[in-house]
Amino acid sequence: YTVPKEQFEQNNKLMASSGVGYISYFHTFNSDGSLHPNSTRMIGGTGQPYVTGAWKGDYWLFEVPVKNFKSGTKVRFTGLTRISGTGQKYWSLQYMDGTSWKPATDTQTATVNGEQITYTHLVPTANMQIDVTMTFARGISDGSVKIRFYCEANTTGGTEPNGGTIRWASSADNGYNDSPVIQVVE
């Protein structure tokens, strides 16, 4: 067992507090895979994962190992998320269905810095509840359910990542273990 700080900050694989699965975050600013100095993965004092330096193309990955996962299975994703004042605002919740990423809920469009984008969530600086149920058209015989939260735009207008943050929050009432949650509902 490794502590959450080491799991996420060093290994990029924060294990679920209950059940199986993990959270990772992928920074994509540098094409060689190296991190920009403003891009970090952190565990806050409450145990909540957050990152600095989010950039268009970055994503949170939520992965749950499965066997004999049948087509037509419904999976519910719930979570609280928020950004700092200089965090990236436009994100898409997507799920891997076969070999394609699909939007987990209705999409919207916006023009950001002259570019038209498609997104599912406009993330505020106060906690936003996400509660989405998606139906997987394709089964998974032996693999993982994959859901990602993908950064769709550079809303800061800068040329490189800044220190703005995005986090998965939770509540003290539940020991900070209630967000995000992924569960099969049908």
Feature names for model-found ranges:
Residues 13-71, 176:
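Surface-exposed, low-complexity/disordered Ser/Thr/Gly/Pro/Asn-rich loops and linkers
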Residues 101, 113-186:
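Terminal, low-complexity interaction segments
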Residues 57, 66-78, 83, 88, ...:
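Extended extracellular/luminal ectodomain segments enriched in beta-structured repeat modules
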Residues 54-63, 78-80, 173-186:
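Aromatic, loop-rich ligand-recognition surfaces of beta-strand-rich domains
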Residues 79, 92-100:
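Short beta-strand segments and strand-loop junctions that repeat across beta-rich extracellular domains
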Residues 1-2:
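Boundary/junction segments of secreted and surface-exposed precursor proteins
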Residues 60-62, 75-77, 91, 130-132, ...:
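Hydrophobic residues positioned within well-ordered beta-strands of beta-sheet architectures
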Residues 99-107:
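Surface-exposed loop/edge segments in extracytoplasmic proteins
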